[in-house]
Amino acid sequence: MTDFTPDAILDATGLNCPEPVMMLHQHVRNLAAGGLLKVIATDPSTRRDIPKFCNFLGHELLQQQEDAGTFLYWIRKKAD
């Protein structure tokens, strides 16, 4: 468990690739620089796709967890 308090939450449960990352892109766009987004997903491909997304665009993946088929990610948006 983390002590991160997100500024926004993206619930992508039940969605499959590429929808979670497409929604993530839109949510990050709407987040203020330095803002924290929590992503909840059930698609196992997010374990690969979300870290790559963050790395490619320069956002910080602070933590990721898996619990009974649910994947949780805490992403800090890069500064402008």
UniProtKB/Swiss-Prot annotation:
MF annotations from Gene Ontology: sulfur carrier activity
Source organism, top-level taxon: Bacteria
Any one GO cellular component localisation term in the record: cytoplasm
Entries under SUPFAM superfamilies matching the protein: SirA-like
Compartment(s) where it occurs, according to its Swiss-Prot or TrEMBL record: Cytoplasm
Active-site annotation: C17
UniProt keyword annotations, A-Z: Cytoplasm
Classification via HAMAP family: Thiourid_synth_A (MF_00413)
Family the entry assigns: Belongs to the sulfur carrier protein TusA family.
PANTHER family reported for this sequence: SULFUR CARRIER PROTEIN TUSA, SULFUR CARRIER PROTEIN YEDF-RELATED
Annotated function: Sulfur carrier protein which probably makes part of a sulfur-relay system.
Name by which UniProt lists this protein: Sulfur carrier protein TusA
Source lineage: Bacteria, Pseudomonadati, Pseudomonadota, Gammaproteobacteria, Pseudomonadales
